[in-house]
A protein has these predicted regions:
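Phosphate/adenylate-binding glycine loop and adjacent helical scaffold
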Residues: 37-42, 48-150
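Extracellular polysaccharide-targeting segments
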Residues: 1-42, 149
Length: 150
């Protein structure tokens, strides 16, 4: 015997079964948990890829320090969360928590560097990093999870 399509309701009256598309159901779930990882990969996955953008399809942010050696950027979530979430950053290269794979261009040394969560609200996360020198540019490759569980 196989059972599918359960619907639980409060009260004594049963209503018609509510059908939702995959996209609608996913959007409702993302109010509680969201990840940038491709489907089928868990948080912190080690792609062990010199060029992580080929395999893991990470978030890529360009940072430029103008008058200081630190900078910050706001990154929006796919859907608004039910509460301010706990955000964890992972390197797109090897899954190291709290770091991003940093491409520093010609003459620079590519490596994992810290990418810090400065502030979270229901709509976005503010991320910050140190670039090491004024006017130095870098690209940060990372994944994230955002948890706003009950």
């Amino acid at each position: 015997i196989e059972f599918t399509g359960y619907q639980l309701e409060v009260g004594s009256e049963a209503t018609a079964f509510e059908h939702r598309s995959f996209g609608e159901e996913l959007s409702l779930c993302q109010r509680y948990y969201e990840t940038s990882y491709p489907t089928g990969y868990s948080a912190g996955h080690n792609f062990n890829d010199v060029y992580p953008f080929n395999t893991s399809k990470p978030i890529v942010q360009n940072y430029i320090a103008s008058d200081d050696t630190t900078t910050a950027i706001s990154y929006p979530f796919m859907v608004n969360k039910r509460a301010s979430p706990t955000v964890t950053i992972y390197s797109a290269k090897d899954g190291t928590s709290g770091q991003a794979w940093t491409y520093k261009g010609t003459g620079g040394t590519n490596a994992n560097d810290a990418l810090n969560v400065i502030q979270t609200i229901e709509q976005s996360v503010m991320l910050g990093c140190s670039l090491g020198a004024v006017n130095q540019a870098s690209e940060k490759y990372f994944h994230y999870t955002a948890e706003a569980e009950l």
